[in-house]
């Protein structure tokens, strides 16, 4: 479980561990963000959000590698581009939760999770 914190060029994660880790990390960081937000610790909310997305991107890269995907940098840069576009759109919409920026981010976030949850394991490298 701890290897999801360390980016590697050859780390892989199985489907079952990916689903469990994704759900667990999202719940833990959701509670942390809510707790820090209620205590008005804005810096800790930002740090928790950055660590959450770092872990999710790292887990997704490991799951992509387990599925046989070899262009990991394409995924990372594409995800960062979606994050930046979402943030710019949210700023333009005055951070409205029902705006397009939030929807772009959520669609990307959960469609990636769904795709990787259903992705087969690469059988050619077993």
UniProtKB/Swiss-Prot annotation:
Alphabetical UniProt keywords: Cell inner membrane, Cell membrane, Membrane, Transmembrane, Transmembrane helix
Membrane topology, record value: Multi-pass membrane protein
Periplasmic face of the membrane: 40, 89-100
Cysteines joined through disulfide linkages: none
Subcellular location: Cell inner membrane
CC terms in the record's Gene Ontology section: plasma membrane
Top-level taxon of the source organism: Bacteria
Coiled coil (residue ranges): none
Segments crossing the lipid bilayer: 19-39, 41-61, 68-88, 101-121
Residue ranges that the UniProt entry lists as topological domain Cytoplasmic: 1-18, 62-67, 122-126
NCBIfam families, sorted: PRK11371.1
Name of the protein described by the UniProt record: Inner membrane protein YigG
């Amino acid at each position: 479980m701890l290897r999801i914190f360390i980016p590697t060029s050859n780390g892989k994660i199985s489907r079952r561990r990916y689903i469990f880790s994704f759900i667990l990390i999202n719940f833990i960081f959701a509670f942390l963000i809510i707790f820090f937000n209620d205590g008005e610790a804005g810096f800790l909310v930002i740090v928790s959000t950055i660590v959450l997305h770092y872990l999710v991107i790292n887990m997704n890269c490991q799951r992509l590698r387990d599925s046989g995907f070899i262009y990991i940098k394409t995924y990372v840069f594409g995800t960062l581009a979606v994050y930046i576009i979402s943030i710019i759109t949210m700023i333009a919409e005055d951070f409205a939760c029902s705006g397009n920026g939030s929807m772009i981010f959520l669609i990307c976030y959960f469609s990636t999770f769904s795709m990787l949850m259903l992705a087969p394991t690469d059988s050619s490298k077993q």
